[in-house]
Amino acid sequence: MAGLVPYLVPIDEVRAFVGSKDPNACMKIEGLWKKELAEEPGIAGALRKMCMGEVTGGDGSAFVWALEILCAHFGQKLPNAAVANADDEWLMRVVDPVFDGWGVGDFVKMKRLVYGTWPVKIPHAESPRGGFVGAEEVKKALEVMRRGALPRFDREVIAVVGDVRGWLEACAARGAGLVAFYY
């Protein structure tokens, strides 16, 4: 079963890498993430193309995997116990209305984290999917969450909302954005 994999990411650092044409930075990442880069064909090439600012065409999925490596390199993976094996349709059908009712739907939604946009321009991929929430939107969502109490819901929904709030708290504490991958 698929699930959501979230990362706390200093978005500006990822954006600075893309198009930097810095071979030392690229080689450092390739050395540190050698095993992960070898898992799928084309990821190392996609990473190099991202560094060179050549992100048009090619296998979109390789670019998404390369982006995940950049998110892990510059940021950190966040706990995801409640969403590790969550169905995307269930998340959008059940959890997104909770976020809308709570008033945070303008800033964070499961649909946005599963079918959203990436923090950098890369070719489209059917899989893996994902999206991001910028640092300012993270702060705004937390302001709303901190002001109002969450209505009563079943344990599964509360667990997902708790995970998401934990991600937002961690990101806000470091002035970072949230990038999620769904696979």
Where do the PLM segments sit?
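Conserved GNAT acetyl-CoA-binding A-motif
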Residues: L178
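Acidic (Asp/Glu-rich) sequence patches and key acidic residues
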Residues: M1-G166, A170-R174, Y182-Y183
